């Protein structure tokens, strides 16, 4: 009974001082001290006094500023980026930004502008990026031209513009990006384009405008970085209108909801009169496709035929000898050989993703592509019991291979011996059957990145990753370990060059203290979404300066002896753990507040215990674990009782002694 009373006494003594101090600051979020702030969607009608004068980057969208003038932002003279998206701005008065000499980006997207003064943009010495998307502009005369000499990008999408004719004094010399997408531009004249003559290597976007006519010679002798006429139903209009022009990239893709004309071989002859390096024709249909369909593509280096309903390409096609990149994703091939790879002798990059039908690899279908460096065959339901030597025959220069999101693949020893130069191999979400005692990757001496996410591997095979001397990035997410434990001897011991290791969602319960002992070069370790306790932190004691993700585990109390291990890391994520916020964990809670600069996900790092603090951020908790006033009172009473007890005990002993002399 005395023991129970004393325990109760100490509980009262030390728990009476536990309390939480929280702050619910609804004002702007500081992203970088004194420089970057987010004030989005706070219902503000003016700049808060809490923002420092040194603010450089301000996100102020979804507030209420119907009128802005030269006093609205005058205090923030160091602004370089200002986002005023959907602030219901109607009026921008004279000299609004006169004191903002360093402002380079101004976002006015989604504001129903009625008036912009001629001098409203005066002040910034190097305004480079101006966003006027969804502002109701119907005429380019609305845009004030003063002080736009250094403008590099102008975004005018989703307005009511029907003519791209700029004012005569519009400064286009430094313009690099001009975006007119989703307007009402149906005709482009020579006079319209004359105002852009000074712009060199311009990226011009007419996507979603349904251009129906281009005056002959409008693009004559012009040079563009990119041209986008996406969603144009009749491509003949574009090919005829772009005669004698030069562009690095021409985007002519369409969309599923647009009823456009099929592409004919005759239509593509318009490319003979222009110079193009990259062409996108996605979502179109070919009325006929023959060996001469692409005969005008002699200068083409990149071709995107995504979702063009192709079932095969004829052999002996002309005009594609210089092609280096080919995209054939979302088509209807039955077998890889149907692409007639011999048509593309210079090809270095091939992408066939998401084929509509189950794709069969065949044997040696790509052997004519001896220069191929990148091959993406993901999301194709590919299935093979013996992969991949015969299928990838003669691809000795291949550096990147993506076989992710496919059906089960069987891998023999040296399964990729035809691709000894591989640097990146992605097999994520493809069930692998390893049919050999040795590693299927053992000849890949240059492999740096290996993605084995959810491959259902036998992780007890200690030789699985043998023969990868320069592997730097390994993703084993979703592969479970026997008994939920990574033991001292494990499959990671053969990859000592690792810098990034991802072991999230592996069902881990514990990690042996010596499990990572051979991995001394690691800089990034992801152990999130497991069931690890704080004891597993010991396995990281030899690592310093790493990014450590321990989110969503079973960590509650972190003992003081483990804090030095955490202190020596650069970034730590402990969010979504059932952390204890009582005095039993006071050393960790103190350390946490002292190291907030190292912690990621602090908004989601909350208390789970005691119930009164559940859901409260650790950074908002303040515990008082010393002796409180109530505790002192009880202590005095306890000591007084103890003194009385001792007094009577001594008195009793003395009386007993004298009685027995």
Curated annotation (Swiss-Prot):
GO cellular component terms, semicolon-separated: extracellular matrix; extracellular space; mitotic spindle; nucleolus; nucleoplasm; plasma membrane
Location of the LRRCT domain: 577-627
Keyword check for ATP-binding: no
LRR repeat residue numbers: 54-75, 78-99, 102-123, 126-147, 150-171, 174-195, 201-221, 275-296, 299-320, 322-343, 346-366, 371-391, 397-418, 421-442, 446-466, 470-493, 497-518, 521-544, 546-564
Protein topology in the membrane: Single-pass type I membrane protein
Signal peptide: 1-23
Intervals, Extracellular compartment: 24-626
SMART domains referenced in this protein's UniProt entry, alphabetically: LRR_TYP, LRRCT
Pfam families to which the protein is assigned, alphabetical: LRR_11, LRR_8
Record family assignment: Belongs to the Toll-like receptor family.
Protein name stated in the entry: CD180 antigen
Higher taxonomy: Eukaryota, Metazoa, Chordata, Craniata, Vertebrata
């Amino acid at each position: 009974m005395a023991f129970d009373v004393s325990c109760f006494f100490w509980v009262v003594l030390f728990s009476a001082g536990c309390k939480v101090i929280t702050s619910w600051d609804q004002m702007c979020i500081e992203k970088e001290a004194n420089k970057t702030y987010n004030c989005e969607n706070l219902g503000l009608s003016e700049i808060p006094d809490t923002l420092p004068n040194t603010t450089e980057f301000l996100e102020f969208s979804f507030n209420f500023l119907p009128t802005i003038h030269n006093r609205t932002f005058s205090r923030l003279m160091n602004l370089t980026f200002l986002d005023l998206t959907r602030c219901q701005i109607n009026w921008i008065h004279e000299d609004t930004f006169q004191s903002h000499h360093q402002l380079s980006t101004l976002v006015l997207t989604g504001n129903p502008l009625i008036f912009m003064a001629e001098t409203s943009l005066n002040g910034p010495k190097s305004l480079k990026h101006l966003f006027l998307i969804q502002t109701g502009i119907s005429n380019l005369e609305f845009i004030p031209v003063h002080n736009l000499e250094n403008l590099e990008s102008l975004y005018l999408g989703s307005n009511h513009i029907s003519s791209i004719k700029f004012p005569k004094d519009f400064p286009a010399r430094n313009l690099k990006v001009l975006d007119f997408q989703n307007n009402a531009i149906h005709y482009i004249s020579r006079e319209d384009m004359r105002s852009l003559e000074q712009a060199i290597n311009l990226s011009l976007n007419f996507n979603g405008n349904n251009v129906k006519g281009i005056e002959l010679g409008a693009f004559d002798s012009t040079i563009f970085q990119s041209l986008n006429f996406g969603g144009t139903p009749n491509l003949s209009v574009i090919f005829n209108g772009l005669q004698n022009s030069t562009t690095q990239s021409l985007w002519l893709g369409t969309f599923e909801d647009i009823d456009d004309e099929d592409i004919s071989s005759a239509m593509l002859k318009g490319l003979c009169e222009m110079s193009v390096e990259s062409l996108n024709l996605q979502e179109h249909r070919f009325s006929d496709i023959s060996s001469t369909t692409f005969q005008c593509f002699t200068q083409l280096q990149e071709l995107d035929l995504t979702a063009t309903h192709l079932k095969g390409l004829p052999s002996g096609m002309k005009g594609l000898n210089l092609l280096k990149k080919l995209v054939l994703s979302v088509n209807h091939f039955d077998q890889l050989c149907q692409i007639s790879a011999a048509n593309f002798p210079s090809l270095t990059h091939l992408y066939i993703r998401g084929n509509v039908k189950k794709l069969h690899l065949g044997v040696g279908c790509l052997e004519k592509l001896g220069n191929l460096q990148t091959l993406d065959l993901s999301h194709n339901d590919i299935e093979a019991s013996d992969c991949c030597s015969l299928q990838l025959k003669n691809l000795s220069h291949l550096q990147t291979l993506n076989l992710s999101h496919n059906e089960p693949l069987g891998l023999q020893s040296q399964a990729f011996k035809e691709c000894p130069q591989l640097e990146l191999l992605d097999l994520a979400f493809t069930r692998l059957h390893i049919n050999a005692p040795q590693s299927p990757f053992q000849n890949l001496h240059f492999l740096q990145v290996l993605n084995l996410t959810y491959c259902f591997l036998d992780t007890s095979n200690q030789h699985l990753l043998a023969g990868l001397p320069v592997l730097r990035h390994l993703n084993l997410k979703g592969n479970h370990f026997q008994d939920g434990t990574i033991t001292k001897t494990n499959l990671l011991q053969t990859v000592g060059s690792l810098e990034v290791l991802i072991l999230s969602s592996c069902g881990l319960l514990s990690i042996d203290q010596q499990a990572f002992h051979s991995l001394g070069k690691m800089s990034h370790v992801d152990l999130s979404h497991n069931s690890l306790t704080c004891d597993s932190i010991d396995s990281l004691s030899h690592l310093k300066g790493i990014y450590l993700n321990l989110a969503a585990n079973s960590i509650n109390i972190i003992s003081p002896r483990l804090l030095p291990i955490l202190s020596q890391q650069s970034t730590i994520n402990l969010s979504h753990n059932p952390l204890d916020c009582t005095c039993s964990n006071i050393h960790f809670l103190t350390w946490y507040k002292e190291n907030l600069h190292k912690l990621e996900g602090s908004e989601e790092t909350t208390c789970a215990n005691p119930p009164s603090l559940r859901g409260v951020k650790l950074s908002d908790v303040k515990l008082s674990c010393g002796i409180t006033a109530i505790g002192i009172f009880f202590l005095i009473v306890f000591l007084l009782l103890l003194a009385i007890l001792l007094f009577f005990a001594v008195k009793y002993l003395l009386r007993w002694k004298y009685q027995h002399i």
